[in-house]
Amino acid sequence: MHQKILLASGDSFTDPKFFSGDKSIDRKLRGGWPMWPELLGKELNLKVINTADSGRGNDYIAKQVLDKIYEYGDQIDTCVIVWSNADRHDFHDKKKNLINIPHDLLSIWGKKKPIHRIQLNILARSYSELFSEEGENKFWENLLNESFRYMWLVAEACAKYNIKFIFRQGVVLLDYNLWNEIYEEGLICDDYQLKEVDYYALCDTNKYALMLDKHYKKNIVYPFWEYDNSIASITDKNSNKLTISKTDRHPNAQGQVMMSRFLHAALANVS
């Protein structure tokens, strides 16, 4: 009898290839440890398929998971997703390489610390220029709706194949404080300012978010778009033990163990 599958996905909190860019610390402390899917798979005695990739957005995560559900169907016992930011977008370049803009928002405007900076390219510059043009006042509504729609589609696919699943946020769904910082520095126009009250209003009234809460309450933590319900809120509170360094807040080896235990406990509530 074939071993059943744990299907996992996410961004750098989940990516087995993750390696910290903080060169100020020993290489042994920058990566190479088992990530939570590997640890959780051993606990559950499941074969692990992990589609996570650092810096990816929720569209990438959902597409990878949906493809695996289509491929393996009821061979999948459990699906656990640690979702990413809503404002990360995937594109294909002329050579069909999958690239992501923005991996780190402030790097588009060249304002981030060198450890986080990505090389500016034509696509990044073109993307940043869009935010100086007025007229797209439904940008945030459409962006958030896209993430919620993908979450709903994955939940429905899991339900169809009787796959046990849970969703959690790794980082906060959308860092409106960061976008306000960009706005205050005059780098984007008024139409792209995102106030806290507007962010919560958009999330609270989104039809897909409401359906997730209605039909899959045990599988999610509602409201899952709040920082306090993210895994980052746990690692940040215990940063000395659970994160890589002062400049890199990704979970370290101990942080990955914490994530595995946290997600294992969450799965017990949907059994």
What are these regions (language model features)?
Residues 1-66, 71, 258:
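Serine-esterase "nucleophile elbow" of acetyl-processing enzymes
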Residues 66-253, 257-271:
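Alpha-helical cap/lid subdomain in secreted, periplasmic
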